[in-house]
């Protein structure tokens, strides 16, 4: 599943290509693309035409387009089109005569003639049109801030983590504590901070927990600079190009490879129906 850096890459692309433009029409081609919308695809199609995109925003793994009523001159957005990429979703900028993808699920036509395609092979992603509450789509208002958010309070997040007796990796994957972190970046930030994924959070000092969050910010900033992590053609930017941070991974997917710090072989253990990758020497469980 695309994590924070991959979603941010898409958000930046949509910002470049959509902000300031008016939506001429929208077409939802597959019911699963609007499965969470009351009224389904027709509800989106009927209510989005004529609106102008004023901003592209993100929180964690969710992104949304802020929409304003262009004819009225309204400048304060109160409506948003939420986009969740799911496992394989892509938001692509296309010319009108582009060959149609067999996995095209929905599309938007802009006033400059460009089309914005939602392509989703596995159909876990979706669009949702709804109200913004304090600038965030109502549907994801419960999602926590992420480590790249300027408003993120690392001290407060660290205190929240320390108050829990669960494994630190399990907590990092909880989007209501800190958002945007999935399996890849959890492994990478734990490796950088030298913390075992099964270490109980309440046994870590507040200072160590803040170091871990800073490690997450550092790792994701580097990943973002490289276009995110792409293991196949499903994770791409709005122009269809893949990122290359997979070449810089230190833990995730590195089973049997020497640790970049000490040379010990990286190991993989099953955790929460997925794998945890770590160095048994650098990341000792305490």
From Swiss-Prot:
* Binding-site residues for DNA, renumbered to this chain: 103, 122, 164
Function of the protein: Involved in base excision repair of DNA damaged by oxidation or by mutagenic agents. Acts as a DNA glycosylase that recognizes and removes damaged bases. Has a preference for oxidized purines, such as 7,8-dihydro-8-oxoguanine (8-oxoG). Has AP (apurinic/apyrimidinic) lyase activity and introduces nicks in the DNA strand. Cleaves the DNA backbone by beta-delta elimination to generate a single-strand break at the site of the removed base with both 3'- and 5'-phosphates.
According to its UniProt record, the EC number is: 3.2.2.23, 4.2.99.18
In the record, the note on similarity to other proteins reads:
Belongs to the FPG family.
Which positions are catalytic residues?
A: 2 (schiff-base intermediate with dna), 3 (proton donor), 61 (proton donor), 274 (proton donor)
Alphabetical keyword list: DNA damage, DNA repair, DNA-binding, Glycosidase, Hydrolase, Lyase, Metal-binding, Multifunctional enzyme, Zinc, Zinc-finger
GO molecular function: any one?
class I DNA-(apurinic or apyrimidinic site) endonuclease activity
What SUPFAM superfamilies does the entry give?
Glucocorticoid receptor-like (DNA-binding domain), N-terminal domain of MutM-like DNA repair proteins, S13-like H2TH domain
Gene3D superfamilies attached here? 1.10.8.50, MutM-like, N-terminal
Q: How is the cofactor bound?
A: Binds 1 zinc ion per subunit.
Catalysed conversion reaction: Hydrolysis of DNA containing ring-opened 7-methylguanine residues, releasing 2,6-diamino-4-hydroxy-5-(N-methyl)formamidopyrimidine; 2'-deoxyribonucleotide-(2'-deoxyribose 5'-phosphate)-2'-deoxyribonucleotide-DNA = a 3'-end 2'-deoxyribonucleotide-(2,3-dehydro-2,3-deoxyribose 5'-phosphate)-DNA + a 5'-end 5'-phospho-2'-deoxyribonucleoside-DNA + H(+)
Q: Which InterPro entries match?
A: DNA_glyclase/AP_lyase_DNA-bd (IPR015886), DNA_glyclase_Znf_dom_DNA_BS (IPR015887), Formamido-pyr_DNA_Glyclase (IPR020629), FPG_cat (IPR012319), MutM-like_N-ter (IPR035937), Ribosomal_uS13-like_H2TH (IPR010979), Znf_DNA_glyclase/AP_lyase (IPR000214), Znf_FPG/IleRS (IPR010663)
Q: Which cofactors does this gene product need?
A: Zn(2+)
Q: Please tell me the species this chain comes from.
A: Corynebacterium glutamicum (strain R)
Keyword Metal-binding carried by entry: yes
Q: What is this protein called?
A: Formamidopyrimidine-DNA glycosylase
UniProt superkingdom = Bacteria
Q: What is known about its subunit structure? A: Monomer.
One GO biological-process annotation of the entry reads:
base-excision repair
Q: Which PROSITE patterns match?
A: FPG_CAT (PS51068), ZF_FPG_1 (PS01242), ZF_FPG_2 (PS51066)
* Zinc finger intervals, FPG-type: 250-284
């Amino acid at each position: 599943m695309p994590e924070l850096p991959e979603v941010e890459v898409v958000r930046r692309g949509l910002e470049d290509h959509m902000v300031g433009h008016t939506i001429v029409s929208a077409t939802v081609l597959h019911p699963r693309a609007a499965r969470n919308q009351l009224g389904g695809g027709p509800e989106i199609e009927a209510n989005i035409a004529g609106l102008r995109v004023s901003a592209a925003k993100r929180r964690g793994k969710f992104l949304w387009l802020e929409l304003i009523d262009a004819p009225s001159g309204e400048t304060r957005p109160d409506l948003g089109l939420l986009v969740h990429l799911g496992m394989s979703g892509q938001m692509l900028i296309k010319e009108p005569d582009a060959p149609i993808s067999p996995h095209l699920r929905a599309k938007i036509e802009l006033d400059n003639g460009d089309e914005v395609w939602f392509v989703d092979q596995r159909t876990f992603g979706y669009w949702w049109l709804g109200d913004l509450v304090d600038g965030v789509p109502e549907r994801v208002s419960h999602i926590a801030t992420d480590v790249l958010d300027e408003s993120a309070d690392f001290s407060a997040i660290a205190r929240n983590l320390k108050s829990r007796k669960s494994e630190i990796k399990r907590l990092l994957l909880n989007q209501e504590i800190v958002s945007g972190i999935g399996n890849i970046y959890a492994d990478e930030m734990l490796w950088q901070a030298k913390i075992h994924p099964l270490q109980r959070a309440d046994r870590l000092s507040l200072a160590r927990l803040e170091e871990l969050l800073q490690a997450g910010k550092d790792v994701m900033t580097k990943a973002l600079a490289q276009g995110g992590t792409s293991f196949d053609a499903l994770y791409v930017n709005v122009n269809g190009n893949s990122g290359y941070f997979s070449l810089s991974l230190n833990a995730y997917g590195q089973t049997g490879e020497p640790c970049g710090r000490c040379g010990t072989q990286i190991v993989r253990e099953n955790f929460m129906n997925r794998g945890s990758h770590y160095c048994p020497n650098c990341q000792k469980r305490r």
